Amino acid sequence: MNAQPGTPPRESVRLVSRRDVRLVNRAGHVYICSSTGTLRVPQRNPELSELEGDIGLEFLPDDVIAGLRSRTLVHSASDAPLSHPLYDTGGPGATRPAVVVGEGPLADGVAERLRRAGAEAVRAPAPDRSADPGALVLPLHGEETLLRRWTERAMEARAPILTHLSSPTRLLFAVLDPPRTACPVCLVRRLRANHTWQPIADLPLDVLYGAAESDRWPTTAIAAAMLAHQTMAALTRGTSGPAELLEVDHATLVTTRHPALHTPLCPACAPVAAPPEPAEPPAVDPESCWGRMRRAVDPLTGLVAEVRVRDADREPGNSTTHVLTAGHPTTTWFSPVQASSCSGAVKYDPTLARVCAVGEFMERYAAGVYDPDRLVRASFRKLGAAAVDPRSLPLASEREYAALSRIAPFDPDLELDWVEGRSLTTGQVRYVPACAVYVPYRFPRRRERLIDPISTGLAAGSGPHHATLGGLLEVVERDAVAVFWENRLALPTLDLGGLTGGPAAAIVERLTAAGVQVLCKDLTTDLGIPAVSVRYVEGPADRPMVAHATSAHLDLHGALLGALEEADLCRTGLRSWLAERDIPGVDDIELDRSDFYTYYCGPGRLSLVPFWDEGPLRPLPAPSPAPASYQAAVEEVVRRLAARGHEPIAVDITPVDVAECGVRVVRSVVPGLCPITLRRDFRRRGGRRLYEAPVRMGLRAAPLTEDELNPYPLPLG
């Protein structure tokens, strides 16, 4: 039977239950049932001891009423119109109107449902400063200039933006809170940059995505209800956490979540958006890194459409995992150049392989995203001592200048673009030529083309020290292989028989069992930072597959493992390239990137570089202790470089969207060290170290002349 009020213990004071709440007295307890769960409290009212069934609030003691009010299960009768388990009547925007932009059945439906829920809904065709919006409902397919003005108005009012695009088959919407999150302009530019068919990506967004609505369509009514609901939640509860673009499939009602990342150089929110700077972890944890970085992988709004894992025949504990990224944004939607998009990794740890593949993409993406207006425009002479002398990068030799009209000799009075970096030895600001930071880089004038931009020194990491370390070690690696290759040095061969257990031993054992010849050279130079180069040779003598790779590390064992893994990645690429294209001729000058990998796969090509097989056999040293942190590792590398007179410089080029994925990208530059190039006719032989390092290392009695340097191309890997 239902309990009757009888004589209530106290008079109800204009309180009512939320509409989804039921109070049931049963078995000595009062059960509070609602859509958010069920609570149970002991029965303390004597009048309820012999009654069971539904009861009213008047039978509950004050402390229970207070608890229910704190959970929004009970509220003042005056709040009844807004009462809902997902809405908070005391939220930041509850007293301000929702501004609904646009005309048509969808906007009409959203405004009407908001009013029925008790909220104030205002229609506005254009940004109006007289209104103080608590939330903004904004179609995503408006003109960018209008989206920008609305975004600026919302940021002034500190109001969340519910932006949307509705079609008969799906609804796209996001609750944004710029500048904390991306803004609608960010989202539009990202959607365009990721669109499959770039020739039409500039069409109005409603055309690209088939936006349409009708008051006869249930899908329009569904979209209006969902948008009104999300607006009510934003009005009454505010926003928090990372933003997402939700995609609701009307056929299946399946919801897919896409990351809503800031777009670099957004004209609406970039001036006030602050990239996140989380604390740098002391060591790389692949799982936690991947947990942050996987936000970058999404076909609609990500930096990378997908990650492809090639490990179908992987043997757990005895093999490597090969990962490639696929589907990359057209960065010319927000940068003057198209960033390089190829990236991949081979690692013993499958999660680390994913992290490194996406990290490599982020390096190249970051290096292709810049604003020319933010560069420092000045001559070397005008900047003075704060500027890095471009001749120390180094530049071309006199002979190379004479042979190449596209490369211009350096003029100290010529205005160039510069990027602000920081010296790792003094902490002072140093200006680095933009062409040595960004790749690709658009030279404003032909006479400013001092070099062909390359990626050496680019690195992504979980923090600034991690990224700086990776970049510095890559610079050291490239310097070591350039000195070795150009001077055709007979350097020690590492005795791999000393490997006992661990990933490096497993890789060598697997490859050797497959008939691959594995040769490892110790390329460590006078800098004292270990560098190892690896060569794999397999297949018939008339068509061998030859893979090369080099790596540097503070521990020679770390350099060895890095080179072995990188060469494994190179093997995978070689299989595709050798199947698709011819091997370049011995004397071919014009080579593309893949030619530098395949050049030594031609018959008899290894005989051109006999020094690879020369040099003493050297046992592996004992492993070196790891530094306590990335910062300590950077300091040790800097110490060794400074001891040889080199000043390393770091330039943080992290775009905001990369930072939102927990990654930093740094370009490390070490003036004076030797670079590599992707040109056979331009090797930047103008620096002295290329000639003098072998003498300092005791490997040459006198420097070689330029005529005596190796004429054959350096293999990539």
Regions found by a protein language model. Give the residues of each.
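Internal hydrophobic alpha-helix adjacent to the cofactor/substrate pocket in enzyme cavities
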Residues: 221-240
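Long, charge-rich, low-complexity alpha-helical segments
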Residues: 2-4, 26-29, 34-120, 175-177, ...
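Short acidic low-complexity segments
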Residues: 121-133
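E1/E1-like adenylate-forming module used to activate ubiquitin-like modifiers
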Residues: 133-223, 267-270
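Short, charged low-complexity linear segments at domain edges
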Residues: 153-169, 235-253
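Helix-biased "structured C-terminal domain" signature
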Residues: 60, 67-70, 241-717
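Long terminal accessory regions outside catalytic cores
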Residues: 1-33, 277, 306-310, 336, ...
